[in-house]
């Protein structure tokens, strides 16, 4: 007898499909931004190459370190609450990456267009506001790394697990490929401003994922 809340196509639960769908959105959001993060830091915020590489490297390292702690916390509060926390933080972080340049431009430190014109931003400490914004993204992303694959494991049986993980990794790859391909056509149309607006795309993806979890994710395993 199946004790899952609702079995979907081919023996998978609704929670399984929701987990995989939000993973698709999260990967699209992540790769759309991460692939140009170093360029964003240098071309939009005025960091030199060393500073931009250092910040980007610390961000990447944190994404692999923090799941040790966030994964343990996720076990205590359950997958659904963890995903809500994760996508809330990711939405705040991505939108923060988009809003920050607007605030810097309003302060007269930079002018954005097809190319970026700095008016003192490289010498201003204000640009370092990016660090807490990236930290929010890092924490949100660390939850995702630990909970989505675990949710897939919980929502499959021995008979469906191999097929379930095949679907999961397909979603990861499709999301990564799609996210990486968005920036070039956007940059061809609006120039360096693309590095700003891509963050709103990623924010929209994580907001959709957040709503999907809130409205659709129900599981007896968490």
Which residue stretches match the model-derived regions?
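Intracellular loop-helix junctions on the cytosolic face of multi-pass helical membrane proteins
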Residues: 1-14, 158-162, 183-222
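Short amphipathic helix-loop junctions that connect adjacent transmembrane helices
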Residues: 35-51, 188
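Loop-to-transmembrane helix entry/capping segments in MFS-fold secondary transporters
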Residues: 49-50, 158-168
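Central cavity-lining transmembrane alpha-helices of secondary-active solute carriers
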Residues: 57-72
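A gly/Pro-rich, aromatic-decorated transmembrane alpha-helix motif that marks the paired
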Residues: 69, 99, 174-189
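C-terminal ends and interior cores of transmembrane alpha-helices
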Residues: 88-125
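Intracellular juxtamembrane helix-capping segments at the cytosolic ends
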Residues: 143-157
């Amino acid at each position: 007898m199946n004790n899952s809340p609702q079995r979907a196509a081919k023996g998978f639960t609704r929670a399984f499909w929701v987990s995989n769908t939000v993973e698709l959105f999260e990967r699209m959001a992540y790769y759309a931004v991460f692939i140009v993060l170093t360029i964003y830091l240098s071309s939009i915020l005025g960091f030199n190459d060393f500073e931009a590489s250092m910040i980007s490297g610390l961000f990447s390292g944190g994404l692999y370190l923090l799941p040790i702690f966030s994964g343990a916390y996720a076990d205590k509060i359950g997958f659904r609450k963890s995903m809500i926390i994760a996508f809330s933080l990711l939405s705040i972080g991505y939108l923060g990456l988009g809003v920050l340049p607007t605030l810097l431009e309003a302060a007269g430190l930079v002018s954005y267009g097809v190319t970026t014109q700095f008016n003192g931003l490289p010498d201003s400490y204000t640009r370092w506001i990016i660090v807490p914004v990236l930290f929010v993204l890092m924490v949100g992303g660390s939850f995702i790394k630990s909970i989505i694959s675990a949710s897939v494991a919980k929502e499959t049986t021995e008979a469906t697990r191999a097929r379930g993980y095949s679907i999961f990794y397909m979603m990861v790859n499709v999301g990564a490929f799609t996210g990486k391909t968005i920036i070039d056509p956007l940059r061809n149309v609006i120039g360096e401003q693309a590095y700003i607006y891509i963050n709103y795309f990623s924010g929209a993806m994580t907001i959709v994922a957040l709503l999907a979890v809130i409205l659709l994710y129900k599981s007896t395993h968490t």
